[in-house]
Amino acid sequence: MLAKIALSAATFAIDRPYSYRVPAQLENLLEPGMRVLVPFGKGNRSSEGLVLSLEQAEETHRLKEIQTLLDRRPVLTPEGIQLALWMRERFFCTVYAAALTMLPTGLWYVLKEGYALAPGVDRETWEAKTAGHPRARQVMTLLHGAGGRADLAQIRAIPDGKDPRGVLRELEKAGLVVRETQARRKVKDKTEQIASLAVDPAEALARMEPRRKTAPMGYEVTSLLCNLGSASVKELCYFTGASHQTVKSLEKRGILRLQEREVFRHQLPDIQQTQPLSPLNEAQQAAYEGLRALMNGGKPEAALLYGVTGSGKTQVYLHLIEQTLAAGRGAIVMVPEIALTPSLLQLFLTHFGRQVAVLHSCLSTGERYDEWKRVRDGQASVVIGTRSAVFAPLADVGLMILDEEQESSYQSESMVRYHAREVAKFRCTHHKGLLLLGSATPAVESRYAAEMGQYHLFTLRQRYNAHQMPKVRLVDMKQELRQGNATGLSGLLREELEENLRRGEQSILFLNRRGNSRMVVCSQCGEVPTCPRCSVHLTYHSANGRLMCHYCGHSQPLPELCPHCYGRLQFVGMGTQKLQEALEESYPGVEIMRMDADTITATQSHEVLLDRFRWKQVPILLGTQKIGRAHV
């Protein structure tokens, strides 16, 4: 048997399925979608690979053999393999890179190369064979002293400054050492020990009764298990005060048995009872009926839901998802910003409970891996997340929604430069599902596709419950400057803020530029400090007194004078930090909360800030696009 494998070591130019011989012990274990370690290239260095297909073949003796099986079950379905092959052609990446993009980082492997003494090689043998070769003897001495094996990094640390690979190749040819590669996964499955009675409850208590006084903790544990049936060892020790040794002794006596149970790291709020959906108005109902007909048509469809802000597109989404779940299928909802996820998640949990999973980059590696497993194992049928949620391993996708589909954040800028909309089209085609693009300001290409009939167009022209659109007033800041107001706060804005404060109402200020000043410029020569890596203008941050690049993260101290002509530096433009300072000066004693990339750092801290704004009634919230789309 041979396997067609996509390799991580292959560049795009040589990326193709490579054939490898399947060893006899793996023939009944290996499946497409599993990862393996294989030798690759002239040096036969170990490389990760993804099994694309298996074939029966007799003439396989000339093929290299698979070294190790890394997965116990496939990490990609047949659909996932097809998607990886399609992404290679569409986004010019390798198949393995596409596969890694689909998987949570907790499933990625880290390979560590090392060398060990060959079997049967003793000290006398290698000393004789390395006589006259001091460098080789150094390596062998290190291996011998390390217990017979050392990582390549340890061997490189030998203090002579030379690359040891040449010597290692010679030692390998001489049969003195063998190369080994260890694969370690970034995150392991989290488990806990569960205790349950191994005998009838009456028998267990009868056996512990004679030891009730001499072993009271053992009796307490047994009594508790008689009432509960089973419990984690951690809970047993907590509620009874027993030690782990007590539980172990009960296991040895055959009174209870211990088993490992998988637990999930990310615990969503437990919704005891879900709420029914709100009724739709006439326009929403018309859009819903049309979209439902497309979804139930049995063929892939794409639609654009073009609705003004506040028209109730989310309610249409919820009713469509309810219909999808009723048909036994799954739904994926993508939002452009992580800040949108908490409020949307709470709304979905209220209606769909534990069927909901969340996938975004603010989860820890372990939490994201566990949520991915819940989706893969069918424990969740509704996935909410940012761009990467498009790869959620739902078995049957009936509906995929891209909210605010025009946003640039759906385009990846990392290793595989995919667009979530393109991937969603592929998946909906495969599953014969509905792709729904929602927006108040659709992308030009999406609106054009709708007008040309490539997408079905549905429109919501009125706000929900006939609410009026807010009035917009434009203020000429140049005129404000002529009148002597250089603060960045217009007279009208000050009046409205003061009126809101007087009424005890909250205000939200949106400024899509973080930092203190947009840029720093020399008043004499006009020189502007730029990033040495990206050549973009650096932004001044007053919190740390440094110039920072918002593209790559480069940071440097603010010079006192222009480095070119020693002229005086001027600060041009206003960022959120400077606006916060102006507000604090204008309204002393008033709490002003800032929400931008500089204040959102810890896991889910955007949720903490939004909750604090909601429940503690912070008077003024200032921020960038982090609040521009948040449900505050």
PLM-predicted stretches and their roles:
Residues M1-S439, S446, E451-H467:
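Accessory, non-ATPase domains that flank or precede helicase/AAA+ motor cores in DNA-metabolism machines
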Residues T274-Q275, A303-T309, V472-T487, M595:
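Glycine-rich phosphate-binding "P-loop"
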Residues I332, F352-L363, P532-R533, T539, ...:
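Conserved RecA-like helicase motor-core motifs
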Residues S364-V375, I600-G623:
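Conserved helicase ATPase core of P-loop NTP-dependent helicases/translocases
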Residues R427, L436, E445-A449, Q454-S523:
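Conserved interdomain linker/interface between the two RecA-like ATPase lobes of SF2 helicase motors
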Residues R502-E585:
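Cys/His-rich short segments
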Residues I627-V632:
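Conserved small/polar residues in nucleotide/adenosyl-binding loops
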